[in-house]
């Protein structure tokens, strides 16, 4: 996958177990430069500082964040995503949504700028995700989802926040134990459950989410 490729770029200068990067036993100081031609809007790794490494032997799946993960350039052409099937597209939409959704609920000193960006992005993803469910070759919808993928996970919607990404961490545990579960599938299952458990911790924020 794209994030595994990024992990290999970090691992290029290290002779040990690549999983040492994800467990922070080894801290990368440099990586091979990479350019991206985006063919599936989902993980946001085309602009993010994140990568994820899985180990089926260890039954572990962990992320690793460093600016060394960021590509030097990205080419985004919505037509390149026309062939992505409905299920994979849907999983991508959920992942994009969750990247901002989780940042939205992270603690902050009432950072309205980040929240307004997040609300606009989530509305955009929901609207265009519905459009793609009816027509996978809707160019405008593909373009909106593609740019949302990039901006949902590049840090903008988390400005001024203590980023924890709890749902992603839970999903990593889920799909590490059962790799047949697609990342977006796991997130789609966990998001409603997380909301049901945590809404009482910040009811005002949940009301804002529902209204906006």
What are the language-model segments listed below?
Residues 5, 9, 45, 84, ...:
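Active-site-proximal flexible loops/turns
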Residues 1-9, 44-47, 163, 167-168:
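Short glycine/serine/threonine-rich phosphate/pyrophosphate-binding segments
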Residues 11-113:
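A glycine/threonine-rich phosphate-anchoring loop and its flanking beta-alpha core
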Residues 1-20, 131-142:
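N-terminal small/polar loop signature for handling phosphorylated ligands or for N-terminal nucleophile
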Residues 103, 107-212:
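Active-site segments that bind and position negatively charged phosphate/pyrophosphate groups
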Residues 1, 35, 152-153:
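Short glycine-rich or small-residue beta-strand-to-loop segments that form or flank ligand, phosphate
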């Amino acid at each position: 996958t794209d994030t595994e490729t990024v992990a290999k770029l970090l691992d290029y200068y290290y002779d040990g177990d690549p999983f040492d990067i994800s467990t922070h036993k080894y801290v990368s100081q440099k990586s091979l430069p990479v350019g991206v031609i985006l063919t599936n809007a989902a993980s946001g790794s085309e602009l993010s500082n994140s990568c994820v490494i899985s180990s089926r032997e260890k039954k572990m799946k962990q992320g690793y964040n460093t600016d060394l993960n960021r590509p030097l350039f990205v080419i985004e052409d919505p037509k390149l995503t026309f062939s992505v099937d409905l299920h994979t597209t849907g999983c991508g939409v959920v992942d994009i949504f969750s990247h901002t959704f989780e940042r939205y609920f992270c603690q902050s000193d009432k950072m309205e700028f980040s929240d307004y960006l997040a609300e606009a992005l989530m509305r955009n993803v929901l609207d265009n995700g519905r459009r793609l469910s009816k027509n996978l070759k809707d160019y405008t919808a593909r373009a909106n989802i593609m740019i949302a993928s990039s901006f949902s996970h590049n840090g903008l919607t988390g400005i001024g926040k203590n980023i924890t990404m709890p749902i992603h961490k839970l999903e990593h545990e889920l799909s590490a134990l059962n790799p047949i579960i697609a990342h977006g599938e796991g997130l789609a299952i966990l998001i409603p459950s997380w909301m049901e458990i945590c809404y009482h911790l910040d009811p005002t924020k949940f009301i804002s989410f529902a209204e906006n």
